[in-house]
Amino acid sequence: MSTPRCFGWRAIGVAAAVLARLPQRATLAFGASLGVLLRPLLRRRWHVARVNLALCFAAESAVERERRLRDHQRSLAVALFELLRAWFAPPATLDGLAEVEGLSLLRDAAAKGQGVLLLTGHLMHTELATRFVAEALGAPVGGVVRRYHRHPCLERLLDAARTRRLGPTVGKFDTRGMARHLRNGGRLVYSADQDFRDGHAFVPFFGVPAATFVGTPQLARAGRAVVRFLSMVRGVDGRYRVRVCDPGLDALLDDPAAFAAQYMAVLEAAVGEAPDQYLWVHRRFKTRPPGEASPYVR
C-alpha cells in the first residue's frame, strides 16, 4: 500500500478510518441524509428492489411497498457507514453498541476442535455483525468469504482491513481453501443465498421460488464442520442485536434440497425481523423455473 500508485487509496483509507469513528448518532443521521440523496440515483438498483418487494410482499399495496423501499434506501445508506465501522473502527468505539447472543455455540465447537460454517445471507450489515462477534470472542472470527476486486490497490486495502479486524479471508470460489480452513477447526462466515445458475434448487423465499445453491452441505461435510447461522438487527435506538443460532441444518447435510429449503426459511425469519435491512437491490430471483421470464426485465 506504500507504492506511489496506491497513494490515493491510502488517502481514502485514512478518510474511511475517520468516518468509522463517528458516534452512532452521527452515523445514523448521515446515513438518513445520504439515503435521501440516493433516491434519484441508482435507478436500476431501485427497480430491482421494487420488483423484489412486489414479489415478497405481494399482499401489500403499492403505497406500502414504496414506504418499504424508502426505509430500505435509508438503511442501505447507513450500511455504507457500517461497513467502514466493521473494517476500520477501533475496538473502543464499538463498546456498548451490540448485544451478542449464542457465543457458546462457537466456543463449544472450538473446544472440540471442530470447524463452524457460519451461514448468513444478503443482510446488509453482515460484516459488522462478524466484527461484533470477533470483539465478543476477543479474537478474529476466523474466516470471511469475499469477492476479489479488479483494482489491486482497493484489493489490498480491503483485504488488509478485513484480515486485521475480522480474520483471514478466503476467495469466493476457493472451495478447497474453505474446506481446509474448516477442517483445521476454523470458522467461516458464508452467505449462501446465492444464485449460481448451475447447481441450484428452487425453494421458497417469501413464498417465491428462489434458485438456491445446493453445494453448501458438501462444503460442510468436506470441512467436517457444524453449521450455524449469523444474523443481526439494528434497532430504532441504533443499538444492534447479534444472534448466532443452530438453524437445524446439520441433520440435512445428505439432502441438499431440504437443506436449501430450511436455510431459506431461517433466513426469511431473520429478514422478517427488520425487512429494511435485507439487500433488496440483490437480484435474488434472476434465475426462474423453466418457462418463466425474469421479473427484472422492464
Name the predicted role of every residue range.
Residues 1-120, 125, 156-161:
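Membrane-anchoring hydrophobic helices of lipid-metabolizing enzymes
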Residues 2-3, 7, 38-41, 63, ...:
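Non-catalytic C-terminal accessory region of glycerolipid acyltransferases
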Residues 51, 131, 160, 218, ...:
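Surface-exposed charge patches
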Residues 92-98, 163-170, 206-207:
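Short, flexible loop segments at the rims of nucleotide/cofactor-binding pockets, characterized by
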Residues 96-99, 123, 151, 171-172, ...:
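A conditional alpha-helix N-cap/helix-loop micro-motif detector
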Residues 112-172, 198-201:
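Catalytic core of membrane glycerolipid acyltransferases/transacylases, capturing the structured
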